[in-house]
Amino acid sequence: MVFAWLGPEGGEPPALPALDCFVAPASHSFAFKGMWQCNWLQAFEVGIDPVHTSFLHRFEHDEDGAETRKAYGRQFRAPSVGDVDGERWPMTRVMREVCSPEIRHETVMPGVTRLTTLRLINERLTHVRITHALFPCTFVIPLSPTMTITQMHLPIDDTHTYWVSFFTSFAGPVDKDTMRAQRAATMTMPDYIPKKGQHNDWGFDAEDQRTRTFLGLGE
């Protein structure tokens, strides 16, 4: 990722924002990019929308222990953090059963908004999700309890957008080979064109919709 100063020649460029992905050691961060067939603003908006996950990423069944252990690098697979009396919901269940959360927003500083999403599970347990929107084109969202995604959206034209994601681990070093393989499998190289799109109904599968996911679009 290359950042350019486009201000007056000889001017002093501002420092990069103090985002986790820019201060983490190289061993704990990983970057990848792709292309979406949509406007950059659509890509930015859906990333900060905490409710779309209950539909676009909704699985009708929870994974068992063996499958959960394979959750590395995949969204909404790891168990949520915290439990009460031994009850700890997997993220698939949180997203599936609590689809109308309370959403709060506040301005942290000019151009930066914090969104807090509260999903009431029971009288003693509430799932809290924190995301940040850095206008005009960046958001920071959780991937798992120990990893975040900082994603930027770069317009190509009105209907095509590059996304660049920085994954930051707050636990051990990032397994970059696994992360790269997971994402490379969804697109063609070296042009980064997604394998699923309007040309093939985004991979819609009626059987998948009947038995596994809300929209029938797989992972």
Predicted regions and their residues:
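C-terminal catalytic domain of Rieske-type non-heme iron oxygenases
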Residues: 3-219
